[in-house]
UniProtKB/Swiss-Prot annotation:
It is found in: Secreted. GO terms for cellular component: extracellular space. Residues 1-25 form the signal peptide. Intermedin/ADM2 is a peptide hormone that plays a role as physiological regulator of gastrointestinal and cardiovascular bioactivities mediated by the CALCRL-RAMPs receptor complexes. Activates the cAMP-dependent pathway through interaction with CALCRL-RAMP3 receptor complex. It comes from Rattus norvegicus. Disulfide bonds join C108-C113. Keywords: Amidation, Cleavage on pair of basic residues, Disulfide bond, Hormone, Secreted, Signal. This is Protein ADM2. Residues 26-96 form a propeptide. The gene is Adm2. The modification Tyrosine amide is found at Y145.
Length: 146
C-alpha cells in the first residue's frame, strides 16, 4: 500500500512539474525564449521630445519603514527633468493609506503561488477520501451535528 501511495505521489509530482511553464521538458529542441525583452541601447543623445530621466529609486511596499525613520534618499521620487513635477522639491513617502495592511492578502511573492497550488493539489490527491478525515458523529455529544 505504501509503495502504491509513493508511486501515485511521484507520478503526480512529475505530472504537475511537466505542466509548469518554463520547464525544459516541454521545450526540448526549441530555442529558449527570454522572459524580458533585452534593454534598448539609447542613441548618442536624448531623443527630441523625450526629456532625459534621472535614476528612479524603487523599494518594495512591504519594506518601507514608518514615516520619519527611513533614509530620505530612498523615499525621494525622481521625476523627468523639465518641470514634470507638480510640487517643487523632493516628495516624501506619506505612509500607508490602509492602517491594517497586514490583514490584507498580498498575493504571490517570488512565485510562491505555484508552490502553494502544487502543495494544495498534492494534498487533494493524497488526502484520505470520504469522511475518514472528519470527526466521528456522536449523537449524544453537544458538539456533534448528529
Amino acid at each position: 500500500m505504501a509503495q502504491l501511495l509513493m508511486v501515485t505521489v511521484t507520478f503526480g509530482c512529475i505530472s504537475l512539474l511537466y505542466l509548469l511553464p518554463g520547464t525544459l521538458s516541454g521545450s526540448l529542441g526549441k530555442g529558449l525564449r527570454p522572459r524580458e525583452p533585452p534593454a534598448k541601447i539609447p542613441s548618442s543623445g536624448p531623443q527630441p521630445g523625450h526629456p532625459s530621466l534621472r535614476p528612479v529609486v524603487w523599494k518594495p511596499p512591504h519594506a518601507l519603514q514608518p514615516q520619519g525613520r527611513g533614509n530620505p534618499a530612498l523615499a525621494t521620487v525622481h521625476l523627468p527633468q523639465g518641470g514634470g513635477s507638480r510640487h517643487p522639491g523632493p516628495q516624501r513617502h506619506v505612509g500607508s493609506r490602509r492602517p491594517h495592511a497586514q490583514l490584507l492578502r498580498v498575493g504571490c511573492v517570488l512565485g510562491t503561488c505555484q508552490v502553494q497550488n502544487l502543495s494544495h493539489r498534492l494534498w487533494q490527491l493524497v488526502r484520505p477520501s470520504g469522511r475518514r478525515d472528519s470527526a466521528p458523529v456522536d449523537p449524544s455529544s453537544p458538539h456533534s451535528y448528529g
